[in-house]
From Swiss-Prot:
The protein's role, per its UniProt record: Involved in peptide bond synthesis. Stimulates efficient translation and peptide-bond synthesis on native or reconstituted 70S ribosomes in vitro. Probably functions indirectly by altering the affinity of the ribosome for aminoacyl-tRNA, thus increasing their reactivity as acceptors for peptidyl transferase.
Entries under HAMAP family matching the protein: EF_P
GO molecular function, one term: translation elongation factor activity
Organism: Mesoplasma florum (strain ATCC 33453 / NBRC 100688 / NCTC 11704 / L1)
Keyword annotations from UniProtKB, A to Z: Cytoplasm, Elongation factor, Protein biosynthesis
Name of the protein described by the UniProt record: Elongation factor P
Length: 185
């Protein structure tokens, strides 16, 4: 595919590495051939790079596959996922899921991204429901609006919650920033 066709979200292979386009811009000066500048994320390492191509240059388009998976459990080293269509189980090293592991509970439905049989990562739902396992006691008389206290949820994530949240309360947590979003119904 031509680099002129690169758009945000497009995946491509360049110098043996797998990238997804974050931003793209085209510039042309005078008689020179146009240049395409691309800010891209390396899908294997997570690093972000800026690549400048000469207009008309070619790159290989990468076909990324996204599958619905169910998180089963982790054994401390690997996380185990199950394909909900084929019931095939896949394991991913926990080191590749440092942020995501803070929100994974048994049975959680997620999306797994893979390329040519290689697992690149997982995508979590925007919000997850977790149970509070530890919470500081609310200070009597502390009625300041918006007052918060520390709490720990079932996955070990430390969060700040309103004073009315106690141990055993199910709360909704945003997976983008790890913050309290509300009380579960």
């Amino acid at each position: 595919m031509s680099v002129n066709d690169l758009r945000p979200g497009t995946t491509f292979i360049y110098e043996g590495n797998l990238f997804v386009v974050i931003e793209q811009s085209f510039s042309k000066t005078g008689r020179q051939q146009g240049k395409v500048s691309v800010k891209a994320k390396n899908l294997r390492t997570g690093s972000r790079v800026e690549i400048t191509f000469t207009g008309g240059e070619k790159v290989e388009k990468a076909m990324i596959e996204r599958k619905d998976m169910q998180y089963l459990y982790n054994d401390g080293t690997d996380a185990y996922l199950m394909d909900t269509d084929t019931y095939e189980q896949i394991q991913i090293p926990m080191t590749r899921l440092e942020w995501e592991s803070k929100f994974l509970t048994d049975g959680l439905m997620i999306k797994m991204t893979e390329y040519d049989g290689e697992v690149l990562g997982i995508s979590l739902p925007d919000k997850v429901e977790l149970e509070v396992t530890e919470a500081e006691a609310a200070v009597k008389g502390d009625t300041t609006s918006g007052a918060l206290k520390k709490a720990v949820v079932e996955t070990g994530l430390d969060i700040m919650v309103p004073l009315f949240v106690n141990v055993g309360t199910k709360v909704i947590i945003s997976t983008t920033d790890g913050k309290y979003s509300g009380r579960a119904q």
